[in-house]
């Protein structure tokens, strides 16, 4: 019984692989260019202190943190 289920599963996966499923169009992985534009680097963060090379204040989106 188990070998029949295994054979059926193998045949189904060969005929319809999981990679054939369409991905959702609004996933960030589908649009790496937009994801890169939305990403703000630490040097461009408004709390980044260029002299000390760290972030002052809140360290939620900025790294390294001055502490």
From Swiss-Prot:
Disulfide bonds join 54-66, 55-62, 59-65. Pfam families: Conotoxin. It is found in: Secreted. One of its GO terms (cellular component) is extracellular region. The modification Pyrrolidone carboxylic acid is found at residue 53. Keywords: Amidation, Disulfide bond, Hydroxylation, Neurotoxin, Pyrrolidone carboxylic acid, Secreted, Signal, Toxin. InterPro entries: Conotoxin (IPR004214). The modification Cysteine amide is found at residue 66. One of its GO terms (molecular function) is ion channel inhibitor activity. Residues 1-20 form the signal peptide. Expressed by the venom duct. Residues 21-52 form a propeptide. The modification 4-hydroxyproline is found at residue 64. The cysteine framework is III (CC-C-C-CC). Classified in the M-2 branch, since 2 residues stand between the fourth and the fifth cysteine residues. Belongs to the conotoxin M superfamily. This is Conotoxin VnMMSK-02. It comes from Conus ventricosus (Mediterranean cone).
């Amino acid at each position: 019984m188990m070998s029949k289920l295994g054979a059926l599963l193998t045949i189904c996966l060969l005929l319809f692989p999981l990679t054939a499923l369409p991905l959702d169009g609004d996933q960030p992985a589908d649009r790496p260019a937009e994801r890169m534009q939305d990403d703000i680097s630490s040097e461009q963060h408004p709390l980044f202190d260029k002299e000390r090379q760290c972030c002052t204040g809140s360290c939620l989106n900025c790294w390294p943190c001055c502490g």
